[in-house]
Regions:
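Membrane-proximal soluble regions of multi-pass membrane proteins
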Residues: 1-24
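Membrane-embedded alpha-helical segments that form the functional core of polytopic membrane enzymes
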Residues: 34-84, 134-139, 195-216
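Hydrophobic core of alpha-helical transmembrane segments in multi-pass integral membrane proteins
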Residues: 176-208
Length: 250
């Protein structure tokens, strides 16, 4: 029962998929970040379904773009937009953190979101779907969430409130880190065997950048920064996927 509640907590927070409602407590939140990667598996499964349907290329690419937004409800895009606004302010640490809490969407966020979707759509049109491509991308979507959960459990926090603090403080950090490290290792091994090693490199480079930016610019991570990482990792891994296929590796 606790396992199902733990999964429900993760899906209730990080997806728009309807799940049974439970009261969040210490027990069912302790390992919620371990269940977070399952949302990536759902996104990947729907991505493969879209790829397998006999759709025109542009319609299929549009589906590839929209699936992660529909599944997650845009929660990570919200964090991406807020972080882009904060970074574009070139203000001090406290000003950036204040911008993250501002519910309004600034001009820089709109510009970055439009640029993001244009790049994402272009890359989706460049990818020719095959079962192998679909499997690689599903593994990548799970991997990025494993890394995101690992960061929540191990990176310093910018403040003692907010989404990241809620899940980090409730987590059994040692156990969560152990599970997600093993999962990330297994996913990476599978991607290497499939010829998608470049996707791992892309994810790790964005992960490193995430740590550097969060420490230097914000004094730690927040829920918005976690969304910023996830969206950037997804875009760069998609670029790596297209490059691997173009180079004949996939």
């Amino acid at each position: 029962m606790i396992v199902l509640q733990t999964i429900a907590v993760a899906f209730a927070m990080f997806s728009a998929i309807p799940v049974p409602q439970f009261d969040w407590n210490e027990k069912n939140m302790r390992y919620a970040m371990c269940a977070f990667p399952l949302i990536g598996a759902v996104c990947g499964a729907l991505w493969c379904l879209c790829g397998a349907l006999p759709l025109p290329a542009l319609v299929r690419a549009g589906g590839f773009c929209l699936i992660p937004v529909w599944v997650t409800g845009g929660i990570h895009l919200d964090g991406y937009a807020d972080t882009c606004d904060a970074l574009s302010s070139y203000g001090g640490r406290e000003k950036k953190l204040e911008i993250l809490k501002d519910p309004h969407c600034g001009a820089f966020a709109v510009i970055r979101l439009c640029s993001y979707f244009l790049a994402y759509f272009a890359l989706c049109t460049a990818v020719q779907f095959t079962p192998r491509i679909g499997l690689c991308w599903t593994l990548a979507l799970v991997l990025e969430r494993a890394l995101s959960g690992l960061a929540i459990a191990s990176f310093p926090l910018a403040r003692n409130t907010g989404l990241a603090h809620t899940f980090a403080s409730a987590a059994d950090r040692k156990a969560v880190c152990s599970v997600l490290l093993v999962l990330a290792g297994l996913l990476s091994a599978a991607l290497v065997l499939l010829g998608g090693g470049a996707l791992i490199l892309a994810a790790l480079l964005v992960f490193w950048r995430y740590r550097v930016v969060s420490d230097r610019q914000f004094g730690g991570i927040t829920g918005d920064l976690a969304g910023w990482f996830l969206q950037k990792a997804e875009l760069w891994m998609l670029a790596a996927l297209a490059a691997c296929q173009w180079g004949g590796l996939l």
